Amino acid sequence: MKGTSSSNNSVVFLSSPVDSFNFRSSFIEDTPCDLYVVVAPNLIKELETYLNKGYKIDCFIPYEVKEKVVNNVTGIIKGKNPFLPPLVLTAHFDHMGKGLSGEIYRGALDNASGASFLLELSSFLASLPQPSRDIIIVSLNAEEFGLLGSKNFAKENKDLLKNATVINFDMIGSDKDIPLTFMAGEDTCFHSDLLDRLCEICNEKNITNIIENKDSSDHASFIKEGFDAITINDGDVTRIHTPEDKIEYISPTAIDRSFSVVWSEIFDSAYSSSGLFLLDSKVLILLILSALICLILKLRS
């Protein structure tokens, strides 16, 4: 159902399947309408009644629109061979902020989880020997405004990132019982070697996973510039963009699952020739037990 805004632009009213909700959408600058309002089913009927009687519904967005310059935050771990295409690791750090009543949309899953995951992963990689290729770490801004940070970064650095592989983290660590989601682009004709490798890693580790062809995270910006890019997430949208997106719903086990998959890919891509050994947990346990047995035998002798 359409109405009018105070600036004489169009407003769309959408009927929700439930009567109570706190979901807030992202702010997208290039949508055909000024405002989309989700209302309860009984309210949509009431609005229709008033419109049919000739009433006018005035709407406004209680936010001031300003042009701002915001920044992505970028770091790099230099590789041994500058001629190899880089590996790019990304996550957006913006969130929905506050509601009209002052309630905080904390964004624990979307996307403090991905931003924190990227920070810890970066710290871990920085502690390792030098990788074979550059690893570029980017904390992206303004994802909730239409992937603006990633659009700018991918476009402005297209030549620098030539043939790069991009792994984006968005909503990591929801529930270990939810399949791990690999989000590829909407264009199903685009073949992703990265996606093939990630699925193969999951098969080797018996990790249930699904593939979604959506452009709803920052991987889409890189794909549109010709890069092989995938978003890894846990596919749980039950609390995101609501005040209930809190840290108590984050699962460390699910985060470990994501790390297990990502580290295997990063190791093969950037560390397999550096002298590091990638050990399966069972192999590591056997090695530790063997070392303990040898130590006990030596002490007894």
Regions found by a protein language model. Give the residues of each.
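Alpha-helical transmembrane segments
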Residues: 286-301
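Solvent-exposed loop/turn segments at secondary-structure junctions
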Residues: 17-21, 66, 81-82, 93-97, ...
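Second-shell loop/turn segments in exported
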Residues: 1, 31-38, 61-63, 101-111, ...
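Extracellular/luminal Protease-associated
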Residues: 1-36, 205-208
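Soluble metallo-hydrolase cores and metallopeptidase-like ectodomains found primarily
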Residues: 24-106, 127, 132
